[in-house]
């Protein structure tokens, strides 16, 4: 029993030490089975964070409705899980006809554009999670034949403004709000391979955490019974 316990202890993925460089950020595409944890993530945002993410302080009922209405077949949602299976960051990539977004309508000849929104839990700030989510969204757009990535946020949203400036997005400010968009290069074999590898690594990481967690619970129950 001690041998099994020790093996699981070595296998378990430990919580990161302080410092963003200590934490491997794995961005995983989310699906229907993640909806409950998505709801927990958004309900965990305080009023100021909800204001920055949604442009208004949504009450719990509207946050719940937003999560319930997420369409995984139409849009793409990315997330970063910690070792306790809590979503630390979520990126929502919504696709729309270019006519639906007048601010970028003339910036592309493609039929669709993409709008990106991101939220990061307070305890996970400073780890580069928002940037990683944006980078994954950008490469996904390229591989989906979308060449214009758009963000709308409050000018006071330091996370999104930092991402916009760092990525070289064109930014227009007006009345405390900001519109930013980035022109993307076409897809290449390299971008397709990169996204596939990143998703596979994230899935392996998720599976390892899930199996380790299940085995640890099983061992704990077995110990109680013996």
Where are each of the predicted segments found?
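Conserved acetyl-CoA-binding loop-helix of GNAT-fold acetyltransferases
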Residues: 120, 126-141, 148, 162-166
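Helix-loop element at the rim of GNAT/NAT acetyltransferase active sites that forms part
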Residues: 32, 40-56
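A generic structural signal for beta-strand entry/edge sites
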Residues: 111-113, 148, 175-179
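A short beta-loop-alpha structural element at the N-terminal edge
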Residues: 25-37
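Acetyl-CoA-dependent GNAT
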Residues: 55-113, 117, 121
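Short catalytic-loop micro-motif centered on adjacent basic/acidic residues
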Residues: 53, 148-151
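Terminal substrate-recognition subdomain of acyl/acetyltransferases
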Residues: 1-24, 118, 122, 152-226
